[in-house]
Amino acid sequence: ISHAHYDHIGSFAKIATLAPHAEILATQDTKHLIEVQLLEFGRISGREESERVKNERYRQAQTLLSRIQVRPVMKTFQMKGCKITLLPAGHMIGAVMIYLETESHRILYSGDFSVKTRFGLNGMRIPGGIFPKVLLLNAPNTYLDADEWQKELILVQSAQREGAGFTEGAEQSGLEPIIKRNLAQNKRVYLISKSIPKNLDLLYFLNEVFPDTPVFLEPKSRKIADTLADMGY
């Protein structure tokens, strides 16, 4: 599992039941965020579903969690004739790219990724010495147009040739001028984040750009913040 954004895990419990003997790997942070979202915050089921359906979905999610094997980042391990290394993908807490090596193949796969460092979360990192023959990228969610994507790709390739990871300063958010304008008018600003992991981006953004502005959290947002704090963020 590359990372724990809901569009990547919402149907995973159902999919896992179709492959009952498949081994499922993830980082510790990804596994924890899956548990928080699907079980503690109830995102495994819809509001209009019957209790029987909800209970079955929870059972599937619990089974999925018990099957997830935690693997460390940047430490190669062996599995079924393959050498596997999980590499930081940026993007969110726990997100990784997967580097697979066999006798005849070298494949680098990534789910969503971020090239730049932003709001306390480092960008993707491809160490020196990794030269895949096949590169599988999930590029639509990098939020770049073709010209910008080409520029970023050139920078990553340059960093790889130099044997170093590539990171850059935090991006400016379109929220900043909107919030500043409202604060200048002595208005209160109400922000909503429907994604549990993206709450961390929002909290880092507010702390970095508006360090002297009081921030009040609703009970559910406070629970999310406490969960992230317990994870060390």
Language model feature labels by segment:
Residues 2:
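P-loop NTPase motor catalytic core
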Residues 34, 199-230:
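Terminal amphipathic helices with adjacent charged low-complexity linkers/tails
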Residues 46, 54-55, 225-233:
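Acidic, Ser/Thr-rich peripheral helices and adjacent loops at domain boundaries
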Residues 5-9, 14-197, 204-210:
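His/Asp/Glu-rich metal-coordinating catalytic cores
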